[in-house]
Structure formats: structure tokens, C-alpha cells
């Protein structure tokens, strides 16, 4: 069995500086001209046109091989492009399409298999791999991932509201990501009974979550709920449980030989963020009530299928190794360690409350579940 000292963050596509965001620069376009038609399809059809011609144009696209993708940033860029094309094809016109043509469906399934992620839009395609510092900002600058220093590469609507929604999410990822290495140190410290290290970590975690709460409160600075609901939200939609939208069987992903598969997937959602689930894991947080607990566990496990495979692996590994809560409970109830732990759990509960307030104004069917958490 692996120990905490065996974990190398880079093996899980995790940056000590940015967490689940990549240290490798996000590509703004694929370097091989072979894939130019994918890039041109995104850039030539303006969001202000309402995507009215997008299906006809995608239907005419050639089927490209994925064998010319080499680096991980290239695979991620391809995934972002193809999921964007899939969303505008399915949801860009008045009536959703229950078919995804082979020119998108085949390479999307191949790219997703490589990345070990579901072949559909996700938090990774909208946020992790579609947000970067604005030109002129040095990526290693401590303030590079302040929301005002970020921009999105591809957009569904071309609005500042959409961009702000995603850059806030990316800034939250970067803020929380900086504490992941400290989590590993705290888990290791438990084995050596270094109580001061665990206590310091819990205090840092509470401060980190408080900073994330502040970022979440900034959502309304430049994201108008009306724009979000009426122009952007449909592009987050999935193909699962969409009978009312005219997709009773989901979406048919065409294959290379004239066949294909009916597939159903959830839409893109911040519930697919590995960071928030990691906070639960490190604190040993459970949702209160057996029925709620089972529902939340099932929901969280389902959301992991929309995370990059290495991120999902990291969460599974941390579930096996996390020992902070049991260590805290082995100490007196009124100790400083207990107080620090309680403050971290309270900070996480407050974050969920603030998120639910945001979700109520920017409603989406896959918003993070409201729940009472118990440490």
C-alpha cells in the first residue's frame, strides 16, 4: 500500500503552486496545422450570431485523427475544443440535437479516453484548461491568478459575464491549490505525532477557505445573473435525464463505421471540482443524516467521472491515507488542535452556504449539494 511519502503531485497532474490547474501553459491553439479546422470552427462562428449555422458547418467538417496529438497540453486543448463544439452543436439552436456527428464524436471519445474523463463538457474543459493569465502577466507572478489578471480562451457568449464566472472559478482553484502540499505534510506529521504541524495546517486551511469565500463573493462584480441564466446556462446542459428537452435517450455519438452509441452525461458543473471534494476528504467531513449521506456520496462519486483521471486517482488515494480527523479526535475536546479543526470545518460549512447563495442566483441543476456537514 502506498504511503503519503510515495505521493508525487506531478504524477497526478497537480501543481504545488496552482493545485489542479496546470503549471504547463494552457494552449490557446493546437500547434499542428492539421487541426486548424477545429480552431477555425470555434473562432469563425461568432457567439453573437447565436450559433445558427454551427450544425451545418460541423456536419461538413472532416473526421480527423488524434494521432497527431503528442503533449498533454495538446490533448487538453483538443478536449476543450471538441467539448465546446459538442455543446454548441447540441444546444446552440432552438431545439437541442440528439445526434453528435462523427467529426466531433469520434475524436472526442478518443481524446477523453486518453485523459480518462467523460467525453462531454466538464469543469475541466470550461475552467481548468480554458483559463490563463492575460498576455503580459507572468504566470509565476504571485498575483497572476487574481481574477482581474485572468481571461478565458474560448467563449460561448463572448460576454464579460461568462468570462468572469470562469476566472473566479479558476482563481478559487489556484488559491486552494497552494495548500495541497501542506495537506500531505500534515498527514505525514500525524504519523510522527507532530501536533504543531497539524495545528498549523488546520489554521492555514481555515484561512485559505476564508479567502475562497471572499473570491466567491466577488462573483457578482461582473457576472450578471440575468446574462448567466438566459445566455450561458444552456451550454452547461448535459444529456442525462433530459426527456423534457427532447433527449429521452441522451445523445447519439456517431461512430466511424456508420454505427455509434446512445450516451447520457451530466452537464458541466463546479461540483466537478476536485478541490472541494479534497477539502471534505482531508477534514473527514460527512454529510449529516444517513439518507443525505448516501445521496451525497453517490453524487460525489458520479461527479468524479467528469474529472481528469489523475485527479480522480489522487482523491481516491487521499481517502485511503487521510488521518487528520481521527488524530484530532484522539486529543482532548478543548485542546487547541480541536479548536483549529473546528474552525476549519466551520469555514468549509460557510463556503458551502455562500456557494448555495450564489447557486440560487445563478441556478444550475448540478450546483453543489446543499448540506449540513459534520466533522
UniProtKB/Swiss-Prot annotation:
Superkingdom of the organism of origin: Eukaryota
Cofactor binding note: Binds 1 heme group per subunit.
Molecular-function annotations in GO: heme binding; indoleamine 2,3-dioxygenase activity; metal ion binding
Pfam families registered for this protein in UniProt: IDO (PF01231)
Keyword set, alphabetical order: Dioxygenase, Heme, Iron, Metal-binding, Oxidoreductase
Gene Ontology process terms (BP): 'de novo' NAD biosynthetic process from L-tryptophan; L-tryptophan catabolic process to kynurenine
Family matches, as InterPro entries: Indolamine_dOase, Trp/Indoleamine_2_3_dOase-like
EC numbers for this chain: 1.13.11.52
Gene3D superfamilies registered for this protein in UniProt: 1.20.58.480
Cofactor: heme
Enzyme class, UniProt record, top EC level: oxidoreductase
Gene Ontology CC annotations of this record: cytoplasm
Reaction equation(s) it catalyzes: D-tryptophan + O2 = N-formyl-D-kynurenine; L-tryptophan + O2 = N-formyl-L-kynurenine
Binding site for heme: 311
Biological pathway: Secondary metabolite biosynthesis
Family, as annotated: Belongs to the indoleamine 2,3-dioxygenase family.
Role description: Indoleamine 2,3-dioxygenase; part of the gene cluster that mediates the biosynthesis of terreazepine,. The first step of terreazepine biosynthesis is catalyzed by the indoleamine 2,3-dioxygenase tpzB which produces N-formyl-kynurenine through the catabolism of tryptophan. The two-module NRPS tpzA then utilizes anthranilate and kynurenine to assemble terreazepine. The first adenylation domain of tpzA (A1) loads anthranilate onto the T1 domain, while A2 loads kynurenine, generated through spontaneous nonenzymatic deformylation of the tzpB-supplied N-formyl-kynurenine.
Protein name as catalogued: Indoleamine 2,3-dioxygenase tpzB
Amino acid at each position: 500500500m502506498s504511503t503519503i511519502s510515495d505521493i508525487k503531485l506531478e504524477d497526478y497532474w497537480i501543481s504545488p503552486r496552482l493545485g489542479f490547474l496546470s503549471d504547463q501553459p494552457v494552449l490557446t491553439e493546437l500547434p499542428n496545422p492539421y487541426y486548424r479546422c477545429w480552431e477555425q470552427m470555434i473562432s469563425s462562428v461568432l457567439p453573437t450570431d447565436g450559433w445558427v449555422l454551427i450544425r451545418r458547418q460541423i456536419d461538413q467538417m472532416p473526421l480527423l485523427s488524434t494521432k497527431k496529438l503528442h503533449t498533454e497540453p495538446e490533448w487538453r486543448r483538443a478536449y476543450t475544443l471538441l467539448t465546446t463544439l459538442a455543446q454548441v452543436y447540441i444546444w446552440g439552436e432552438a431545439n437541442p440535437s440528439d445526434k453528435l456527428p462523427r467529426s466531433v464524436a469520434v475524436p472526442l471519445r478518443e481524446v477523453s479516453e486518453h485523459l480518462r474523463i467523460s467525453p462531454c463538457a466538464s469543469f475541466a474543459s470550461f475552467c481548468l484548461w480554458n483559463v490563463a493569465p492575460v498576455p503580459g502577466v507572468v504566470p509565476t507572478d504571485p498575483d497572476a491568478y487574481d481574477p482581474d489578471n485572468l481571461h478565458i480562451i474560448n467563449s460561448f457568449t463572448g460576454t464579460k459575464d461568462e468570462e468572469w464566472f470562469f476566472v473566479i472559478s479558476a482563481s478559487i482553484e489556484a488559491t486552494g491549490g497552494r495548500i495541497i502540499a501542506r495537506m500531505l505534510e500534515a498527514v505525514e506529521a500525524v504519523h510522527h505525532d507532530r501536533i504543531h504541524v497539524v495545528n498549523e495546517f488546520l489554521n492555514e486551511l481555515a484561512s485559505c477557505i476564508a479567502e475562497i469565500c471572499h473570491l466567491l463573493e466577488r462573483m457578482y462584480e461582473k457576472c450578471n445573473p440575468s446574462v448567466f441564466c438566459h445566455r450561458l446556462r444552456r451550454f452547461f446542459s448535459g444529456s442525462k435525464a433530459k426527456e423534457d428537452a427532447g433527449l429521452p435517450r441522451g445523445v447519439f455519438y456517431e461512430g466511424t463505421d456508420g454505427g455509434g452509441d446512445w450516451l447520457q452525461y451530466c452537464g458541466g458543473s463546479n461540483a466537478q471540482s476536485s478541490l472541494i471534494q479534497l477539502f471534505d476528504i482531508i477534514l473527514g467531513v460527512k454529510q449529516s443524516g444517513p439518507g443525505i449521506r448516501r445521496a451525497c456520496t453517490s453524487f460525489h462519486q458520479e461527479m468524479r467521472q467528469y474529472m481528469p483521471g489523475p485527479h480522480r486517482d489522487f482523491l481516491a488515494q487521499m481517502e485511503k491515507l487521510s488521518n487528520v480527523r481521527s488524530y484530532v479526535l484522539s486529543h482532548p475536546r478543548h485542546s487547541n488542535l480541536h479548536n483549529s479543526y473546528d474552525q476549519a470545518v466551520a469555514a468549509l460549512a460557510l463556503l458551502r452556504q455562500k456557494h448555495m447563495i450564489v447557486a440560487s442566483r445563478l441556478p444550475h441543476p448540478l450546483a453543489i449539494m446543499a448540506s449540513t456537514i459534520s466533522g
